[in-house]
Swiss-Prot record:
Protein name per the record: Phosphoribosyl-AMP cyclohydrolase
Intracellular or extracellular location(s): Cytoplasm
Function: Catalyzes the hydrolysis of the adenine ring of phosphoribosyl-AMP.
Lineage: Bacteria, Bacillati, Actinomycetota, Actinomycetes, Mycobacteriales
Catalytic reactions of this protein: 1-(5-phospho-beta-D-ribosyl)-5'-AMP + H2O = 1-(5-phospho-beta-D-ribosyl)-5-[(5-phospho-beta-D-ribosylamino)methylideneamino]imidazole-4-carboxamide
Any one Gene Ontology molecular-function term assigned to this protein's record: zinc ion binding
Cofactor: Mg(2+); Zn(2+)
Organism annotation: Mycobacterium sp. (strain KMS)
SUPFAM superfamilies from the UniProt entry: HisI-like
């Protein structure tokens, strides 16, 4: 199958045909991770509700949790105002980060909240 042409026409891709995907935890709103998608990954994600991404390093599609069991069930997909980023609202099973942490954004605080 191919991505719905109406959706595809709204996407702005980089030179490699990719766009940013942000995975946000359903319920908490916490950002879990950022990855890349292409049209095929978005189509697969929308058809299966299993988050599918594009690996730039491996040059292939991957389904989150396919090997680790740490899956992302996708509840909704939203396109940002510029058309270059999608927001996936997901139910995360296990850690989202490859380091074993719940989110990829808990390593270094560059600017702490004001007290």
């Amino acid at each position: 199958m191919a991505l719905d042409p109406e959706i595809a026409s709204r996407l702005k891709r980089n030179a490699d045909g990719l766009f940013t995907a942000v995975a946000q935890e359903r319920g908490t709103g916490q950002v879990l991770m950022v990855a890349w998608m292409d049209d095929i990954a978005l189509d697969r994600t929308m058809r299966t509700r299993n988050a599918t991404y594009w690996s730039r390093s491996r040059g292939e599609h991957w389904v989150k949790g396919e090997t680790s069991g740490h899956t992302q069930h996708v509840h909704s997909v939203r396109l940002d105002c510029d058309g270059d980023t999608v927001l996936l609202e997901v139910e995360q099973s296990g850690p989202a980060c490859h380091t074993g942490t719940h989110t990829c954004f808990d390593a270094d605080v560059l600017l702490a909240p004001e007290a």
